[in-house]
């Protein structure tokens, strides 16, 4: 079953993009699926929120967890949420979703989980699962700018291309200092000021950065290859702009702060993060709120076998906490 109405209404200026019209379907492999199933199944859940639907891999597995739970509830559910309207439009008519009354697909951010619960006349969920990585669909979409390989792609970087401000416009709306600070804070890029200066110089010359290749070339010139020989010189800058444009860290922080209000006592939150900024927020949120009991003293990592089969999982970290009764 699907929900056609979006959970969120944009409060900021929006700029539509053709990227929102379709979503290419690629072979997306969910990260740490066995671990997610293990930690969620143990509580025999009746309502699970998959806050990052993506390719639907975790949602399918979580639906089977519901089936295994043997609940007395008449309406066990997996509430799947995704920010990308193209993904929701693509998948809402798939038979495994449309014909399964246990699955509800919503358009919105995981920060709007309480709205999804309210739409179904529910007050609490038993589990929340978040996989904070980029999906294969997003990486494959040439209109998004998530990959460095398409030089003429628009520098967009939005998860929801129908709302908010694309990265190239964000750059034009901020000062050189604000750009440098964002690249340093969200990308931990040591050469952020060099990069910001070049971006700002182009804007002053009325030749602003609008394409992926233009920003990649600036990063190549500003980041000494010997300093970051293990990663592409543009990696940290693109990460920083993506985080800024989508308010990723703010949304994660607010969600974990509010989650104890709508996760049932005894329920669990499982978060898969992919870089230190996200992981730090998750760790501190679980540690600082007495309503959480940390179940993973150290973050769990994917097995060697999974990394070999799915290289994008190599940097994943899973933390799980229980809502104290």
From Swiss-Prot:
Keywords: Cytoplasm, Methyltransferase, rRNA processing, S-adenosyl-L-methionine, Transferase. Residues 15-24 have a biased composition (Low complexity). Its main location: cytoplasm. It is found in: Cytoplasm. Coiled coil: none annotated. GO terms for biological process: rRNA base methylation. Gene3D superfamilies: Putative methyltransferase TM0872, insert domain (1.10.150.170), Vaccinia Virus protein VP39 (3.40.50.150). S-adenosyl-L-methionine binds at residues 56-58, 82, 110, 131, 138. Residues 314-325 have a biased composition (Basic residues). One of its GO terms (cellular component) is cytoplasm. Its EC number is 2.1.1.199. Residues 1-28, 303-325 are annotated as: Disordered. It catalyses: cytidine(1402) in 16S rRNA + S-adenosyl-L-methionine = N(4)-methylcytidine(1402) in 16S rRNA + S-adenosyl-L-homocysteine + H(+). Belongs to the methyltransferase superfamily. RsmH family. Specifically methylates the N4 position of cytidine in position 1402 (C1402) of 16S rRNA. This is Ribosomal RNA small subunit methyltransferase H. It comes from Rhodopirellula baltica (strain DSM 10527 / NCIMB 13988 / SH1).
